A protein has these predicted regions:
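Glycine-rich adenosine-cofactor-binding loop
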Residues: 7, 90-93, 100, 109-133, ...
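NAD(P)-binding Rossmann-fold cofactor-contacting core
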Residues: 131-147, 281-288
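Rossmann-like adenosine-cofactor binding region
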Residues: 145-211, 328-335
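Conserved phosphate-donor/acceptor-positioning beta-strand/loop module used by diverse small-molecule
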Residues: 338-358
């Protein structure tokens, strides 16, 4: 029997790791083109599938029976073969309910603004209706109201949910909208889980709002799907799995004065945690040669541009120990790329203890 995730492009999916942790070692990835779907669904060795964009509607149409949730939303993200026929369910619905609870967000009686109009956004809409949302508004690039009409809702929206891929790895950090003008905003949900903290979520936290990323959504829907696949209740708590995945993905970022010991500490941490260590200054030196010579010939401003580009590239990766250059934190634009996947630790030493050699 085969289980897995069906999609068109699945390069950075966490689903196999989640399902392996849930006891399904045969779970794998299936990348298919639209013209391959009919033959794929007919494969008798397939027992269970999760389905992601752009095939959730095709999955709905391929199922012979449907759960009440799937019928209500018109979307299938989980397929299970029962007596030779495909049964469809929508565990994204359950994942979204879990996310709201995880982020301590009340939507009853609230005005909710959804960014996006795809299959996932329709599931969110039905869930919000069921929870008693006062009004649900979709912004889209295809139909009105459009993203450029967002100003009409600055003094109305209380909960914002991003159901688009804008801000997802590798095109991060990016955001569709600026949260600052929203006067009644209480919380933000972003279904993106890579990076852990999108630009939208980081701004939400800076504004003191409730914020939750897509990891609780992803894990909760996967747990529900796994229970359908294996026909047994999961022995692993959803919250424990979320914390484990976040810990694996989150970078450890060391900042501090030159000579404070970032490289020494970073290498030790990497060895202890089994992570890859990256010294940003060393990575830059591979490209431009000795940093001191570059600053002398090109100027510090030119070097800071090179440094910021390196931070942009490295910061979007996950599971690393990263040592920054001493002056990296003096550039405000470096914060988002570092914080999106990282937890930042400042190393300190008395000035007379700082290393000056090298």
């Amino acid at each position: 029997m085969k289980f897995g995730l069906l999609g068109r492009t699945l390069g950075h999916s966490y689903s196999p790791a989640i399902h392996h942790a849930l006891g399904n070692e045969s779970y794998t990835l299936f990348e298919k083109e639209p013209d391959q779907l009919a033959d794929f669904f007919a494969d008798p060795s397939l027992q269970g599938l999760n389905v992601t964009i752009p095939y959730k509607i095709a999955a709905y149409e391929a199922c012979q029976t449907l759960s009440d949730r799937a019928q209500k939303t018109g979307v299938v993200n989980t397929m299970v073969r029962r007596d030779g026929a495909w049964h469809g369910d929508n565990t994204d619905y359950l994942g979204f309910l879990y996310s709201l609870d995880y982020g301590h967000m009340e939507v009853a009686g609230k005005v909710c603004l959804i960014l996006g109009d795809g299959a996932s956004s329709h599931t969110l809409h039905i869930a919000l209706e069921d929870l008693g949302a006062k009004e649900i508004i979709h912004l889209s690039r295809k139909t009105a109201p459009f993203y450029q009409d967002v100003h009409h809702f600055y003094h109305k929206a209380q909960i914002i949910i991003n159901a688009t891929p804008v801000g997802m790895y590798p095109k991060c950090p990016q955001a569709l909208i600026d949260l600052a003008p929203f006067s009644l905003l209480e919380g933000v949900v972003d279904l993106i889980y890579n990076p852990l903290r999108t630009s939208l979520l980081l701004q939400a936290r800076q504004l003191g709002l409730k914020a939750v990323n897509g990891l609780p959504f992803l894990v909760a829907q996967a747990v529900a799907a796994s229970e359908l696949f294996l026909e047994s209740e999961s022995l692993i708590k959803t919250e424990e799995l979320i914390k484990s995945l976040q810990g694996d993905q989150e970078n450890i970022i060391l900042v501090g004065m030159p000579g404070v010991g970032k490289t020494t500490v970073g290498k030790a941490l990497a060895q202890r945690t089994g992570r890859t260590f990256i010294d940003i200054d060393q990575e830059i030196s591979k490209e431009i040669g000795a940093i001191s010579n570059y600053i002398q010939t090109q100027g510090e401003a030119a070097f800071r541009q090179v440094e910021s580009k390196a931070i942009q590239d490295i910061g979007k990766r996950g599971g690393l120990v990263i040592a920054t250059g001493g002056g990296a934190v003096t550039i405000e634009d470096n914060f988002l790329p570092l914080r999106q996947n990282g937890r930042i630790y400042q190393l300190t030493q008395p000035l007379d203890k700082l290393a000056t050699a090298g």
